[in-house]
Amino acid sequence: MVDLNGISPKNKGYYVALGLEGSANKLGVGVIKQFVDGSPTEIVSNIRDTYITPPGEGFLPRDTARHHKNWCVRLVKRALAEAGVTPGQLDAICFTKGPGMGAPLHSVVIVARTVSLLWDVPLVPVNHCIGHIEMGREITGAQNPVVLYVSGGNTQVIAYSNQKYRIFGETLDIAIGNCLDRFARTLKIPNDPSPGYNIEQMALKCKNKERLVELPYTVKGMDLSLSGILAYIDSLAKDLFRKNYSNKLLFDKKTHEQLVTVEDLCYALQETLFSMLVEITERAMAHVNSAHVLIVGGVGCNLRLQEMMEQMCMDRANGHVYATDERFCIDNGVMIAQAGLLQYRMGDYVKDFKETVVTQKFRTDEVLVSWRD
């Protein structure tokens, strides 16, 4: 059993951490308490502000960084006030080291360094992916599941072994969230609250579910490729908008009647992408002899993905799917605080400010998970 109490807490019986997340367009600040006796983590503040662009547009690093720079200090003040915590009570300040977009990461780490010096509180650099996993484990109570990590920047199937989160399969090109977001831009649907959520809602309106539009399905062993399916469905959407009657898949050859709607395309995209995810996840479960799946990351909020994963798990003895809602699936500060405080309690925190340099590339399996057996 790992001893997590090697460093004494400032507060009697519990540790307090401030978490700062800003690797993409979500800026999250959270405050948590972890207890010496091993009681469940208490989330005392979880605030988020999202940089939202107009329909049909993505978010540029420089604009996202400007948003984070303008809002980060205000969110820190709000989070501490909401939590009823003073800077003197903080055991650690945790920030996202990577992976993510360079400029937004820099905006947030500058705030983390500044308040660390002002308040004389240790800094803890956190891997974004590890934050998702540890928050998911804490909220759901999942002990040792296969993890499906699906977000705008990452698509990985992960399992724990020998103090590392090992990657068993991943995307070979773009992430699933990026695929959904880019298709949403093609359709020019709103980015509020998120493109993926709006695609999910459009898919629910599909009236031709028995006539699934056939899309490329590219699974290569434990890995998958998503750029081909995006290019193909983009071309279908553009033909639909241009009313390209020569496309026999979309229009009747004789009457030019429209056979496929935008909602049909959204439904087909979700069904195909999620089927690929279920396949590689089940393969990983068989490999490590696990019956449990934990879904984390922004795309993990999708109820259809959760439903398809549950259907797969029903065929396995004692199969179970663990998932959280948008408070914890979508990027947030408390997940960084959760993973960071575990690191801090094992003595893993910044001794030299050179260790606070952020990075756009930081793989899940690079981190020593010292707080687990």
UniProtKB/Swiss-Prot annotation:
What name does this protein carry?
tRNA N6-adenosine threonylcarbamoyltransferase
Residues annotated as binding substrate? 149-153, 181, 196, 200, 302
Q: How is the cofactor bound?
A: Binds 1 divalent metal cation per subunit.
Show the coiled coil region(s): none
Q: Which CDD domains match?
A: ASKHA_NBD_OSGEP_like_euk (cd24132)
The EC number on file is: 2.3.1.234
Q: Fetch the InterPro entries from UniProt.
A: ATPase_NBD, Gcp-like_dom, KAE1/TsaD, Kae1_archaea_euk, Peptidase_M22_CS
HAMAP family, from UniProt? Kae1
Localisation per UniProt entry: Cytoplasm; Nucleus
> Which molecular function terms from Gene Ontology are attached?
chromatin DNA binding; metal ion binding; N(6)-L-threonylcarbamoyladenine synthase activity; nucleotidase activity
Q: Where does a divalent metal cation bind?
A: 128, 132, 149, 331
What biological function has been recorded for the protein in this entry? Component of the EKC/KEOPS complex that is required for the formation of a threonylcarbamoyl group on adenosine at position 37 (t(6)A37) in tRNAs that read codons beginning with adenine. The complex is probably involved in the transfer of the threonylcarbamoyl moiety of threonylcarbamoyl-AMP (TC-AMP) to the N6 group of A37. KAE1 likely plays a direct catalytic role in this reaction, but requires other protein(s) of the complex to fulfill this activity. The EKC/KEOPS complex also promotes both telomere uncapping and telomere elongation.
Q: List the keywords (alphabetical).
A: Activator, Acyltransferase, Cytoplasm, Metal-binding, Nucleus, Transcription, Transcription regulation, Transferase, tRNA processing
Q: Which family does it belong to?
A: Belongs to the KAE1 / TsaD family.
Its needed co-factors are:
a divalent metal cation
Q: Which GO terms describe its biological process?
A: positive regulation of transcription by RNA polymerase II; telomere maintenance via recombination; tRNA threonylcarbamoyladenosine modification
- Supply the gene name: KAE1
Per the record, the domain of life is Eukaryota
Pfam families per the UniProt record, alphabetical: TsaD
Catalysis: reaction(s):
L-threonylcarbamoyladenylate + adenosine(37) in tRNA = N(6)-L-threonylcarbamoyladenosine(37) in tRNA + AMP + H(+)
This protein's GO cellular component annotations are: chromatin; cytoplasm; EKC/KEOPS complex; nucleus
Which organism encodes this protein? Candida glabrata (strain ATCC 2001 / BCRC 20586 / JCM 3761 / NBRC 0622 / NRRL Y-65 / CBS 138)
Gene3D superfamilies given for it? 3.30.420.40
**Subunit notes for this chain?**
Component of the EKC/KEOPS complex composed of at least BUD32, CGI121, GON7, KAE1 and PCC1; the whole complex dimerizes.
